[in-house]
Amino acid sequence: MAHKKGTGSTRNGRDSNAKRLGVKAYGGETVTAGSILIRQRGTSVLPGINVGIGKDDTLFALTAGVVKFETIRRGLRNRKRINITAAV
């Protein structure tokens, strides 16, 4: 028989690293070609004009210009879309 109380163990003592998701370039900002605009899981924001999409759903600028967000009706719900317009 133990004469000292054993230390308990826990099954919850860990956490995952933050993935740094979110908007990296906001509306009205000037960006260069290749700049990351949004890091996301799934397509919560859709790519628009002059915007590409990576295999992990990251949106990036295909050309230099100004970031512009818009809301579009897609099916039964509204979706956000991000475009790059030419800088004037």
UniProtKB/Swiss-Prot annotation:
Signal peptide feature range: none
Start and end residues of each stretch annotated as Disordered: 1-21
InterPro entries in the cross-refs: Ribosomal_bL27, Ribosomal_bL27_CS
Domain of life where this protein originates: Bacteria
One of the GO biological process terms: translation
Coiled coil segments of this chain: none
Alphabetically ordered keywords of this record: Ribonucleoprotein, Ribosomal protein
Gene3D superfamilies noted in UniProt: 2.40.50.100
GO molecular function terms attached to this record: structural constituent of ribosome
GO cellular component: cytosolic large ribosomal subunit
Family: Belongs to the bacterial ribosomal protein bL27 family.
PANTHER family hit by this protein: LARGE RIBOSOMAL SUBUNIT PROTEIN BL27M, RIBOSOMAL PROTEIN L27
Name of the protein in question: Large ribosomal subunit protein bL27
Species the sequence originates in: Parasynechococcus marenigrum (strain WH8102)
Chain's gene name: rpmA
